[in-house]
C-alpha cells in the first residue's frame, strides 16, 4: 500500500514540476494572440464573444434592398426610438395611476393600452426595416421627464403633446420618403400610422377638454367621475 502511494506521489510531483515548461511552450492561436496580448491564457467567454460579434461584417449589402435611401433607413431607426420612448412614457403613466395613493385604475388601463400600442408601432417599423433590406440600429431610450404625473389632466396634456411630437416626426419621415421617390414607404406610413395618429390626437384633445370642463384638477371628484364613466366605458369596448 505504501509502495503504491510513493509511486503515485512521485509521478504527480514530476507532472506538476513540468507544467510551467508546458505552458511556456503553449502558443495561443494567432486570432486570439493579436486580440489578447496578455499572454497565452485564453480570453474569457464574454470577451471572446464580443470579439467574434465585432468581427462580423454588419455592413454587407442586402439582396432585397431596392429604392431605399440611406437617409430613410436612418430616419426609420430614429422613429423606432421615438415610438419606444412614447411607450416608456405611457408605461410610467399607467403604473403611476395604479398607485395606492392615486387609485384611478381606468386611467391606468388607458395608458397601458397606449404603451402597448406604441411598442407595436416600433415593432412594425422594425419589420419594415428588414423587409426593405435596411439595418436596425437600436439606440438608448430616454427616460420620461417625470415620475410623478400629478393628476389625470396633467397626464392627458402630456400625452397630447407627446402624440403631436410623434405625429410631426412621422410627417417629416413621409416628406423625406416623398423627396427620395419612395412610394412604398409613403403608402406604409399613410396606411398604418398617419390616420391613427390623427385619431389619437383628437381623442386626447377631447379628454383634456372634458376634464377641464368638469373642473379638474381643482375639483377632485371630476377625475374620479371621468375615470369611472368615460374611461371605464371605453375599456369595455
Curated annotation (Swiss-Prot):
Signal peptide: none annotated. PROSITE patterns: FERRITIN_1, FERRITIN_2, FERRITIN_LIKE. One of its GO terms (molecular function) is iron ion binding. Residues 66-215 form the Ferritin-like diiron domain. It comes from the Eukaryota. Pfam families: Ferritin. Keywords: Iron, Iron storage, Metal-binding, Mitochondrion, Oxidoreductase, Transit peptide. Fe cation 2 binds at residues 118, 163, 197. This is Ferritin, mitochondrial. It comes from Mus musculus (Mouse).
Amino acid at each position: 500500500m505504501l509502495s503504491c502511494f510513493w509511486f503515485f506521489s512521485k509521478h504527480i510531483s514530476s507532472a506538476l514540476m513540468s507544467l510551467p515548461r508546458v505552458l511556456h511552450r503553449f502558443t495561443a492561436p494567432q486570432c486570439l494572440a493579436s486580440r489578447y496580448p496578455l499572454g497565452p491564457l485564453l480570453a474569457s467567454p464574454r470577451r471572446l464573444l464580443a470579439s467574434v460579434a465585432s468581427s462580423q461584417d454588419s455592413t454587407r449589402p442586402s439582396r432585397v434592398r431596392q429604392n431605399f435611401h440611406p437617409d430613410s433607413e436612418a430616419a426609420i431607426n430614429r422613429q423606432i426610438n421615438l415610438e419606444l420612448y412614447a411607450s416608456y412614457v405611457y408605461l410610467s403613466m399607467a403604473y403611476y395611476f395604479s398607485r395606492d395613493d392615486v387609485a384611478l385604475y381606468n386611467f391606468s388601463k388607458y395608458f397601458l393600452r397606449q404603451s402597448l400600442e406604441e411598442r407595436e408601432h416600433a415593432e412594425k417599423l422594425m419589420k419594415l426595416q428588414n423587409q426593405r433590406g435596411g439595418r436596425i440600429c437600436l439606440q438608448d431610450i430616454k427616460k420620461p421627464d417625470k415620475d410623478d404625473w400629478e393628476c389625470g389632466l396633467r397626464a392627458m396634456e402630456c400625452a397630447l403633446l407627446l402624440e403631436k411630437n410623434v405625429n410631426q416626426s412621422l410627417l417629416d419621415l413621409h416628406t423625406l420618403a416623398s423627396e427620395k421617390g419612395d412610394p412604398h414607404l409613403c403608402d406604409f406610413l399613410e396606411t398604418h400610422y398617419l390616420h391613427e395618429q390623427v385619431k389619437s390626437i383628437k381623442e386626447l384633445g377631447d379628454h383634456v377638454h372634458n376634464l377641464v370642463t368638469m373642473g379638474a384638477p381643482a375639483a377632485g371628484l371630476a377625475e374620479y367621475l371621468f375615470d369611472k364613466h368615460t374611461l371605464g366605458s371605453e375599456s369595455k369596448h
